[in-house]
């Protein structure tokens, strides 16, 4: 075991990273060695046991905790580890399998004080809190000391306060850094291995940067960062715009691996550090908070690569060479407590533990923690989003949560996909979670099913049981895109989250998050939220012939640019949507599948969430269909069946008494954007390579197209019918066309209706239902290609290396595929004539209650 470990250690050292944490088998072998240590290995063996085993409810932690408990109880005698040392080591394991033995050891006079010292710093107590409280009540002195320590928040006060002056060396990345730059999609397989994944950060050459990757497209500027650290300070990540794009916490993990410090007793994880950005995207900001980092929005124009600066967080100043070069205000003073606690999640759990202990001891509420500033009183009404969150925190019906209020809304629905799922699994283990408190948690395999690596196959095999054993619902590889499924399981006007930035509920509201916060939401059933402001987009008038919903999606950034609320340039970036909720009105009769196209794209606006005002009829139609789908899932053996049955009953209860929240007429918005549909007479595209760079199609007509992609969560069955009709049986189209339906249900119906024949005739490459090209983590288009795509975003290098990607509708992609270029307005409208004649049958959605095989199967499923 030692020989193999040292070999692995040297291989990783050659890469400049530490070895992997020990797994359960290695820990079992390590324990045998500790019982009979080879000569000269004592210190090494103890170091492995102390520092290289994951905490929480990891399988390896279970083996470690069982061994240490046996030694601490005196059932097993080991020369290297005394009873007291074993108890001390149990106290470093964060929570989970170590907690029960520590509580038992409070009754052992020999080690009770050591056990108490460990429990005082253990936050993940959950129901075990009651066991300690009971011992204290029964007179156990050490249990009383633990309760008092929790009440006094010694877990918090024992940690250093945020320094008044933090000296850092600047690592500046000019322009926009998106999460694809920090955590590239093709390297998604390595995300759970934080140090290894870090090596891919900034691996693609950036012409405007002071650094170069060590191997273009493979390894980022790691040595450059190490050289900056030699100035003797932590490195701060600095950029004009930081963290836009996907919700992946792996982006924050990589930044903090460069800028933070090791977490004691937790292998291969770091916390802390400083990130400075002119704009910091909201989900990235949150994952920074969760990781104990200090994210600061500040003008960075006077900072240069390699500068040594002082960050004065309490004064709100950046000082360079004795001169103040920028001033800032922290998002909230609570950030100081989050950093001190080692992260926002630690702070929330710890504050709750302290409150519980004080209540049990009959003490008043603690005044130790900083509280968020309550917003100013106002008599204004509430927006739809504010009312939804109000209901989720238990306010009286019709009351809402004002912007700026800190709250913890109930998470009714939580989603996890397969490139973030393995990280969410690890975070759930770290949180000692053995069962979900959120009402419904769903796991998908949409990003890796088509072209799995060995590590993906392992995930496909192991993750479903991990999720369903905790009461979640696990999809299967090939089922399709997480969002297209999760939307089918939603309850109106409820709140949720998901480990993917496109978790944007078309009914209700979701606040997508990184894997740490998703794990917290799934485990505890609530999620921390500083209620954002809202921006209202109001459509008016009638859609014009040939104009699609995707064009309305792109109209939002286009009209925001016209109103001065959005700029494409990154320096001094303006984005009125960033960190706010996008609320959409004026299209109340959209089908829910159509509404999702609008809510989904709020991710590209960097909005915190999205609501859409819909009439009851389309929602009733959708939910009636969804009950049949969920019954089919139960019949097909999807687990956890009890969770699906519970959701069916809740949907049926809503349908029996349909009731929708509505915004008050006097609700306040940060901005209101009005879009007159009569003014949109042609498609709107987003130009390479920025989803904010929206233009009318006529401005780019004639651009040669090499490849086209019709797929992603932005599509539904209607788009594929339209594309098949527009291809019109043409052979040998001049463009390489990729087609990927969002779910297996869409695929099945499209095949049945004969549309796959049209794709085949055209020579299209039809992909397994799922994400396909959209994330760029598996298949990609040819290097340097110009592409028209229905995917979510067109960041540089996302669909393929050095590509130029236009975002547009499925209809436009099909027409461009036939012509080999972006059409003129006349060419477009001529082609769309065939669709305009038959919109009712083309844009007909999947109503499972009206599809015979689904309806028949559902009849056989009873509660």
What are the residue ranges of the model-derived segments?
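Amphipathic alpha-helical packing elements
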Residues: 2-31, 36, 335-348
